[in-house]
Swiss-Prot record:
This is UPF0145 protein LPC_0273. Belongs to the UPF0145 family. InterPro entries: UPF0145_dom_sf (IPR035439), UPF0145_YbjQ-like (IPR002765). The lineage of its organism: Bacteria, Pseudomonadati, Pseudomonadota, Gammaproteobacteria, Legionellales. It comes from Legionella pneumophila (strain Corby). PANTHER family: UPF0145 PROTEIN SCO3412, UPF0145 PROTEIN YBJQ. It comes from the Bacteria.
Length: 105
């Protein structure tokens, strides 16, 4: 079954038959020692911190997939109002949350 996902509050041309509630995927990541060292050096001289960008992208993708799995467990075929949120966990960890409302279309 294909999961339709939107950041909007509806799917154009579709009728939402049932709202199933909030679904989410949460991932907490911290950089490896080498990523931390490279990030520290980059922060001194400036520039893009590629290792951190890659870590964040992987965390977002994993959180997104976990949200989809949560929706599938509810037999949803759509997710509306999908959002990402991030926060720091301690000094070295970053939390990525992906959430939305599971629906049946």
């Amino acid at each position: 079954m294909t999961m339709m996902i939107t950041t909007g509050n509806s799917f154009e041309g579709k009728v939402i038959k049932q709202y199933l509630g909030i679904v989410r995927g949460i991932v907490v990541r911290s950089p490896t020692i080498s990523q931390g060292l490279m990030g520290g050096l980059k922060s001194i001289v400036g520039g893009k911190i590629g290792a951190y960008s890659q870590m964040c992208e992987h965390a977002r993708e994993e959180a997104f997939q976990l949200m989809i799995e949560h929706a599938q467990a509810l037999n949803a075929n759509g997710i509306i109002a999908m959002r990402y949120d991030t926060g720091e966990i301690g000094q070295a960890g970053t939390e990525v949350l992906c959430y939305g409302t599971a629906v049946i279309i």
